């Protein structure tokens, strides 16, 4: 079983390489209307060095960088203005007063509004999700709770090319416990000359290190290659060998279907500014499975028993939050991991972005995404051979083993020239040293015609 089950790879007719065919896919797209819910940066604006209002020109850019930062939903301004008006008009009363004509709950309950919407995206119960902090900060909090090394079980299994912030976080927790990172951090990578890490290799690492490993922490989707890991299979197997299992879902959140509760994942964390469109540095989210979030009062109301974590007043139950008696009683579930009063301004941006997802489902978005990425792959490979191409797609070809992103490894010396040429053509995508262009058509706002146009520009840039 794969993360998304068995996915059939879309097949395309003989005329699929034409612009007319791309336009026909757009015309038949049931989600096409969602594009109107976003502000697409214009070609003129992305070339400007001064602040400009949206729509400086009528010609939008082609924005394939949602795997780095999503574009702004039109709802964001409305939600922010509502929050600012609440603050300016009633001040501190905004914590408890529900404004009838605002799309937002009172500040005291606003994080729960966001968590409820996020829970549908990650496949969890609302009380298993908390809207809080940022990704690395949340990983620190979760590691403090779940990484409990012993004299015999202290290793952490992780991705060989983890995003640097994840690596730093794990390394710091290892050092915090006075352990040697070189001996404690076990890096799982692909075989020499390849980029995909087979599931069986991960399982073999679990077998090899199970007696000494305390935890495995992997990315749901590897940020560099775009590989989607088999979350349920890896989680189940690691549990069978006695490991705690955590996932960094930075590139999986709002990109692929997730069922964190059903898959019995112990903990997970994600950012919301990529496919989630909540804005640069937006408030993040975390998941704690219900089995770890329970609060036991069997020994009395003043002696709650719960999983150890770093605590703060906002993780305290609302019934005691303002009593100021220094008797911590955590909110059951992920909410009990909250530390401080969250920014109502940040939550407004997050709730605005989530309001778009509330109008559809991850199943529908994933269905379109699989077709878009397959079409991109088809056009990139058409009329080429391994020998003639000046790039290699290092993302798995199996739709069940990838999300929206394709990572193109260019031949040496081409990256900066190609990236410059694409930007001149009004195309925004992500480059990663030493030679990868990451292309991510996002089903909420990108089109099949844009995919066709991108491929024409890329091939022209490679031929220069």
UniProtKB/Swiss-Prot annotation:
Major place of residence: cytoplasm
Catalytic class of the enzyme: hydrolase
Pathway in which this enzyme or protein is active: Amino-acid degradation; L-kynurenine degradation; L-alanine and anthranilate from L-kynurenine: step 1/1; Cofactor biosynthesis; NAD(+) biosynthesis; quinolinate from L-kynurenine: step 2/3
Biological process per Gene Ontology, one example term: 'de novo' NAD biosynthetic process from L-tryptophan
Keyword Cytoplasm: yes
Residues annotated for pyridoxal 5'-phosphate binding in this entry: 135-136, 163-166, 248, 251, 273, 313, 341
Modified residues (N6-(pyridoxal phosphate)lysine): 274
Catalysed reactions, semicolon-separated: L-kynurenine + H2O = anthranilate + L-alanine + H(+); 3-hydroxy-L-kynurenine + H2O = 3-hydroxyanthranilate + L-alanine + H(+)
InterPro entries tied to this protein: Aminotrans_V_dom, Kynureninase, PyrdxlP-dep_Trfase, PyrdxlP-dep_Trfase_major, PyrdxlP-dep_Trfase_small
Cofactor requirement: pyridoxal 5'-phosphate
NCBIfam families: kynureninase (TIGR01814)
Function text: Catalyzes the cleavage of L-kynurenine (L-Kyn) and L-3-hydroxykynurenine (L-3OHKyn) into anthranilic acid (AA) and 3-hydroxyanthranilic acid (3-OHAA), respectively.
Family per record: Belongs to the kynureninase family.
Descriptive protein name: Kynureninase 2
